């Protein structure tokens, strides 16, 4: 079992503890530099965590929130990660936070990625907190097995920023921060729930190619220790 494994009795206990830990990191960044940055994942797992975090007492006006990855769909779309964050995180005190979306109303995903790279550069580097998720295929962010630009996304020499990704398991074209943008976050979290994902994590921790299970790049090569939060 990983040295940085945080195990909870249930998803609500996890959501509260992760919100406490992320809130404390953001508060420390604000105290040190006057601002804080947070990149979160989409999908079904982070909803309860988002709701808990939105209630944490912080000077949210000094926090900038963005996404680790996004579908190339407008925020009105049910599958938009922007929409998930707007509905569950950017409320209560956290409504004061600045949100920088990855989706941009551009003609192509490539054009949107270029705009998103420029806009997210204002968050500075490294990011203070990054919360990753993981799919049962071993993807994290939009680093999908078989992804069109997986090699480039995982290459540590690829610059910080947002690139496009297409993959069979991804549905829509995606926008994703590169590995280099995420791996050195001040607090780097992997949030997973359920016995299925615990088994996937165990598989990822065993030997094998990063291309088969891209989460391995974070487990093996991230400059910051990956803090794994899990509940059944
Ligand atoms: O496609 C995505 O899926 C992963 C995992 O989602 P979940 O529904 O299994 O929690 C997520 O981390 C990523 O941000 C999202 O775009």
Curated annotation (Swiss-Prot):
InterPro entries per UniProt: 6-phosphogluconolactonase_DevB (IPR005900), Glc/Gal-6P_isomerase (IPR006148), NagB/RpiA_transferase-like (IPR037171), PGLS (IPR039104)
GO biological process, one term: pentose-phosphate shunt
GO terms of molecular function: 6-phosphogluconolactonase activity
Protein name, entry field: 6-phosphogluconolactonase
Domain of life: Bacteria
Annotated coiled-coil segments of the chain: none
Family listed: Belongs to the glucosamine/galactosamine-6-phosphate isomerase family. 6-phosphogluconolactonase subfamily.
Family annotation (CDD domains): 6PGL
